[in-house]
Amino acid sequence: MNGISNALNGLYDISGVEVGQHFYWQIAGFQVHAQVLITSWVVIAILLGSAVIAVRNPQTIPTAGQNFFEYVLEFIRDVSKTQIGEEYGPWVPFIGTMFLFIFVSNWSGALLPWKIIQLPHGELAAPTNDINTTVALALLTSVAYFYAGLSKKGLGYFSKYIQPTPILLPINILEDFTKPLSLSFRLFGNILADELVVVVLVSLVPSVVPIPVMFLGLFTSGIQALIFATLAAAYIGESMEGHH
């Protein structure tokens, strides 16, 4: 009987896992999603702090830390050049910012003890655990590839919507809406699912089982950041080249 009671209590704890509770600030009559802002500011502070440490005293013979950041920069350049082509240079900061923000955000969900900070409603989690963040990142990507196409081709950029035949106009327009949606939902779904799986396993077996899952989550979080940055660069390159 005690075993059944413990199992039922475990299921009850799992049923209490919340996905949709939010904590809001009221600013000038508007509701501001405070959880995302707080965690995003922490991630931005980590990135800015790391950047300051990396560039404050550069050495001719790089130190271990400088070597690491130079490797990251070279990796981002390679991704940008592969997807965009020879005109990749101006887009390295954008692609790099996307990759690093998503990467650190994803890892913060597993490595930072967000839940020790008590909120009136909901709880803190990785910024990319919220659909508002992933949609915002996807919309920024949309603005970037429209800007890339318009800056390269002018108004002639819009001729792609009637190629190879005007009949495809609705489909080509719909494609530009589905690109950011697919980016945002893929990232949101993977990060949310990873955190929920860890929470459920911790509720059932709190000591051993969640550890391998957390390591797997760190790996997949890095892959998701790379996929998002790679697809963003590919969309920008596609808009500049004008092919599908």
UniProtKB/Swiss-Prot annotation:
Gene: atpI
Membrane-spanning parts: 35-55, 92-112, 131-151, 196-216, 217-237
Function: Key component of the proton channel; it plays a direct role in the translocation of protons across the membrane.
Domain of life: Eukaryota
Pfam families to which the protein is assigned, alphabetical: ATP-synt_A
Alphabetical list of Gene3D superfamilies matching this protein: ATP synthase, F0 complex, subunit A
The protein, known as: ATP synthase subunit a, chloroplastic
Organism (species): Gossypium hirsutum (Upland cotton)
Cellular compartments annotated: Plastid, Chloroplast thylakoid membrane
GO molecular function per UniProt: proton-transporting ATP synthase activity, rotational mechanism
